[in-house]
Amino acid sequence: MVRVTLVNYTKRPLETITWAALISYWGEWSTESFERISENDVEKHLPRILGYGHESILEHATFTFSIEGCSRVCTHQLVRHRIASYTQQSQRYIVLDEENVEETFVIPESIKKDRELYEKWKKVMAETISLYKESINRGVHQEDARFILPQAVKTKIIVTMNLRELKHFFGLRLCERAQWEIREVAWKMLEEMAKRDDIRPIIKWAKLGPRCIQFGYCPERDLMPPGCLKKTRKKWEKVAESKS
């Protein structure tokens, strides 16, 4: 199972965003005024300013996540979100040494449901690991031996995004039509944010959710799964209101 952890983020993120927003409106704004920004100031100004559509201020808060145990299929989708920073576990320098197929690869549930097919997958993956290790033992450097590894191999990656890019990411990847693995990662990222009292309010204020939450309707209405809107809104509201 993939593990997602919010490891770091901008100190006093909502106060930082509010302080940045007020530079345009507040005649008494100064560098020193940051220390005077209170929770009341945040609640008074931030929802209103975001309601005007002034979302560039969200870029002043950044969030760093650690993601462990997803496949390279997932990270190939993740890094398409270019306004972000990524550092991924290297297959060039780190040798894959797990013997357990389940610990080494992500196998979709659709494969596991077919017992015969599942056993064939595990057999091929075990042979892949064996040949990979044999290649290294025969003097092939891991940067070449890795060519045999499939996209299903588990990996680790650190992701840093600003809040505006996170909103864009969530809009696409929390959707029921997103690929299942990156959708799971996206929901866990949002859940990690919801655990923090100093972050949770922004989830609703900035509508950090799938596009049906952001727009108020599904932009892919003709392709929408039955009952999707109601199910997604209920799930999102539960996360947005959850506490650590």
UniProtKB/Swiss-Prot annotation:
Active site, renumbered: R173 (involved in ionization of n3 of dump, leading to its activation)
UniProt record, GO biological process: dTMP biosynthetic process; dTTP biosynthetic process; methylation
Binding site for FAD: S56, R80, H81, R82, Q88, N162, L163, R164, H168
Cofactor: FAD
Record keywords: FAD, Flavoprotein, Methyltransferase, NADP, Nucleotide biosynthesis, RNA-binding, Transferase
Pathway per the UniProt entry: Pyrimidine metabolism; dTTP biosynthesis
Pfam families xref list: Thy1 (PF02511)
Cofactor binding: number and manner: Binds 4 FAD per tetramer. Each FAD binding site is formed by three monomers.
CDD domains hit by this protein: ThyX
Keyword field contains RNA-binding: yes
Record's note on what induces expression: RNA-binding protein that probably controls the regulation of its own mRNA.
Catalytic EC class: transferase
Domain of life: Archaea
Domain ThyX: 2-207
EC number, as in UniProt: 2.1.1.148
One example GO MF annotation: flavin adenine dinucleotide binding
Positions that bind dUMP: Q77, L78, V79, R80, Q88, Q89, S90, Q91, R92, R146, R173
Complexes and interactors: Homotetramer.
Family to which this protein belongs: Belongs to the thymidylate synthase ThyX family.
Functional description taken from the UniProt entry: Catalyzes the reductive methylation of 2'-deoxyuridine-5'-monophosphate (dUMP) to 2'-deoxythymidine-5'-monophosphate (dTMP) while utilizing 5,10-methylenetetrahydrofolate (mTHF) as the methyl donor, and NADPH and FADH(2) as the reductant.
Protein name stated in the entry: Flavin-dependent thymidylate synthase
Organism listed in the record: Pyrococcus furiosus (strain ATCC 43587 / DSM 3638 / JCM 8422 / Vc1)
